[in-house]
Amino acid sequence: KYDAKDLESKLFVPERNKIIVDTYLKFVKDKRTVVFCASVNNAEQVADLFRANGIKAEAVSGAMKQSKRSKILKDYEEGNIKVLCACDLLNEGWDSPKTEVLFMARPTMSKVIYMQQLGRGTRLCEGKEYLLVFDFIDNANLFNAPLSCHRMFNIEEYVPGALVFGQGDRK
């Protein structure tokens, strides 16, 4: 778990938000994108910057009225909004198969949350061939590091054909 004030000082910097928007403009402009942000305030800041750059974007949160939130999500589904910026709200229980891009812009120590967020973009949809994920926090390296038997059992040297585990059970 992260301290909210510490996150504010580390993540809510204009330069970082600009990198997020610049990445969208350079690589995935006009693709439906979800930006997972560290807080509601952060989501609003990032959405503001997208709009300042001519991109139809909205922040969504549990703090807003249900009717407003539903309208924003409907507009996103219909393609009227290209970028959704959210904090936790869309992690689970929300499906949008048309989402083509995810921006991971919040840290998490939870593999479950990371996988839930990743799952928001993995839904199949006609015409969707792939999902692009941009990780601005490096969660991917934390949760997707390759795991081998050698690493699991602290075996430093790979020897072709050697037993990796169960060596003590041999008779």
Language-model region placement:
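Conserved helicase ATPase core of P-loop NTP-dependent helicases/translocases
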Residues: V34, N42-N91
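A conserved SF2-helicase RecA2
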Residues: V112, R123-R170
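A short beta-strand element within the Helicase C-terminal
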Residues: K82-T108, I113-R120, Y130-F136
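Conserved interdomain linker/interface between the two RecA-like ATPase lobes of SF2 helicase motors
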Residues: K1-V34
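Short, surface-exposed connector motifs at secondary-structure boundaries
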Residues: K26-T33, N53-K56, P97-E100
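A generic secondary-structure signal
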Residues: D22-K26, L49, D75, R120-G121
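Short, surface-exposed amphipathic charged segments that create phosphate/polyanion-binding patches used
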Residues: K1, L73-D75, L147-F153
